[in-house]
Amino acid sequence: QVEGDIDWPRRFDLMQHHSGEHIVSGIAHARYGCENVGFHMGSDVITIDLSVELTQEQVRELEEAANRYIWEDHPIQIAFPSPQELEVLTYRSKKALTGRVRIVSFPGADTCACCGTHVSSSGQVGLVKLLSCQKFRSGVRIELVCGKRALDHLSRVWEQNHQISNLLSAKAGETAGAVARLLEENQTLKGRLAALEDTRFAALAEQYRDAGDLLLFEEGLSPDSLRRLAAAVLETCGGRCACFSGQDGSGYRY
């Protein structure tokens, strides 16, 4: 005798994602004429390959429509139509089917031939979050998470944003602007540093005027600084110049 137990948290997670994928694919099909041409359920995210390129605005609309459908808590219907009923039924299917066909319906969102497990109503999906949309072949590949995975993702993003908010003394909703200002300040400082280096490099170039071939070692220079130093010295030394920075333990840049 063999007894088995369902790992319910894992099963429910997979059901949430499977049903969420149907809702997103069905709405994308109805709104934008997309065919679902690929689907992979991973341990972190699931991916959907759609046959039509979507704009970022369309992706936002798709996410909003899918969540609205979830929150309306529609019952999910499963049926085995007769061959006569199938002939007049419009449903999604990736291949021609024979024999008994199982139809899973999300009223108002999707009707699809499917043999997988699903939640009993759209509300049990909880939440769907589209994480990315990248061009893939002639269409797009969308990464998404549903249910608890979506909540966990948003919690991680919130925690990261909260830490950035504290580090930059910015409000949680204004961290992007604070980071942009920090990057701008960094670029300004880099420009000032480069100007100071160029003054020093010009003095070194004068020091090595007509010195011929040179091999120079300078501490703490970046690859860009080394290139600018070499260019300055080459104009005055009358020979070839190689510039290095670093040390034996960590290696050298040149």
Predicted regions and their residues:
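Conserved nucleotide-binding/hydrolysis modules and their immediate coupling elements
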Residues: 1
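Well-ordered mid-protein domain cores that form the structural environment of catalytic cofactors
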Residues: 5, 23-30
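Short glycine-centered, acidic/aromatic-flanked micro-motifs in structured strand/loop junctions
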Residues: 6, 50-52, 217-219
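Short pre-active-site segment immediately N-terminal to the catalytic Zn-binding motif
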Residues: 8-18
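Functional cores that coordinate and move charged inorganic groups
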Residues: 10, 29-136
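Generic alpha-helical secondary structure
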Residues: 17-21, 25, 59, 63, ...
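Divalent metal-coordination and catalytic microenvironments
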Residues: 22-24, 48, 116, 142, ...
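Terminal appendage regions of diverse proteins
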Residues: 125, 131-254
